[in-house]
């Protein structure tokens, strides 16, 4: 082996040693507030780039992949946090019937929501409920239950929430030296904190407002519109129309299934204490025995060719 060959081998071994050394020094586990601040400040100054290089330059003992996921899923200013709203639930169910598990495509129509968040919602809520019912989430039976029962019930809840919000003020005023923090943002850092420092940097000393996990402000206005995706799938900002799932003429609910709903006389949104929870995921608090009965009845109607 010549001198050149030995030199290349030594360099390769050194690179491998450095890589192993860096991996041993990589930090695992939850991100700290200080790490979040360092990542946000670095991206504010230099922008996004190659994440492995960014992690080294920002002096973060994290992998490039960890930095990328932390930024995209939690720290980006436009990321929306908090429970999936009723309107978002309806849209997810609607889009999934068209596109299946194409989470990135679905996320395009839910501003501020990441594909990972939507996927987790589907798996922890919809798939879990289908499993409890011993029903395949991809079966026609389960799809019909969503289309003819749960989605109309969601519409009812959205309309009820809209009516209940009429008496509430639709706006919040603050003095010029106050910041309004959306209660959906539960990140360590809120992008509004950037405004509190004329240099655009965040430090532990000036981030007391930013790291507040919950705001005292609550959403005062609930949209009265229930949106349905338009037919043009190529639109970046899709044309949205207001659906009417309760309209029998549309074929979504026929007379037999409406009678079946009336006979059930169920309150689909009560929890075990008989109280309606004040969070949006209460939609899935449905009694299993009642679901089984409806699934069986619906399957009989479907088998008889009434749909």
From Swiss-Prot:
Upregulating conditions: By salt (NaCl).
Biological process annotations from GO: response to abscisic acid; response to salt
Identification of the protein by name: Transcription factor MYB78
Disulfide bonds, paired cysteine numbers: none
Gene Ontology CC: one annotated term: nucleus
Domain HTH myb-type: 23-79, 80-130
Keywords, sorted A to Z: DNA-binding, Nucleus, Repeat, Transcription, Transcription regulation
A single MF term (Gene Ontology): DNA-binding transcription factor activity
InterPro entries (UniProt xref): EOBI/EOBII-like_plant, Homeodomain-like_sf, Myb_dom, SANT/Myb
Source organism (scientific name): Arabidopsis thaliana (Mouse-ear cress)
Gene that encodes it: MYB78
Main location: nucleus
Cellular compartment(s): Nucleus
Database matches in Pfam families: Myb_DNA-binding
DNA-binding region(s) from the entry: 51-75, 103-126
């Amino acid at each position: 082996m010549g001198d050149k060959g030995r030199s290349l081998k030594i360099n390769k071994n050194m690179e491998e040693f450095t890589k192993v050394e860096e991996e041993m020094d990589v930090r695992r586990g939850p991100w700290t507030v200080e790490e979040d601040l360092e990542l946000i400040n670095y991206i504010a100054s230099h922008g996004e780039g190659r994440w492995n290089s960014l992690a080294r330059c920002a002096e973060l003992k994290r992998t490039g992949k960890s930095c990328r996921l932390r930024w995209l899923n939690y720290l980006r200013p436009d990321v929306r946090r908090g429970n999936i709203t009723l309107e978002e639930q309806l849209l997810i169910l609607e889009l999934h019937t068209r596109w299946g598990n194409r989470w990135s495509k679905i996320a395009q129509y839910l501003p501020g929501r990441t594909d990972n968040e939507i996927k987790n919602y589907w798996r922890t809520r919809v798939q879990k409920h289908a499993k409890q019912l011993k029903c395949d989430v991809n079966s026609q039976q389960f799809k019909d239950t969503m289309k003819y029962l749960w989605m109309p019930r969601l519409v009812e809840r959205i309309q009820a929430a809209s009516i209940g919000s009429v008496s509430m003020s639709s706006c919040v005023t603050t003095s010029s030296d106050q910041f309004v923090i959306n209660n959906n943002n539960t990140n360590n850092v809120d992008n509004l904190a950037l405004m509190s420092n004329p240099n655009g940097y965040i430090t532990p000393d000036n981030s007391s407002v930013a790291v507040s996990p919950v705001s005292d402000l609550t959403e005062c206005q609930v949209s009265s519109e229930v949106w349905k995706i338009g037919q043009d799938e190529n639109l970046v900002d899709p044309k949205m129309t207001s659906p009417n799932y309760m309209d029998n003429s549309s074929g979504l609910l026929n007379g037999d299934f409406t009678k079946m709903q009336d006979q059930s006389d169920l309150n689909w949104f009560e929890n075990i204490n008989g109280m309606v929870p004040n969070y949006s995921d209460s939609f899935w608090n449905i009694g299993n025995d009642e679901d089984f009965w409806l699934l069986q009845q619906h399957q009989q109607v479907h088998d008889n060719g009434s749909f």
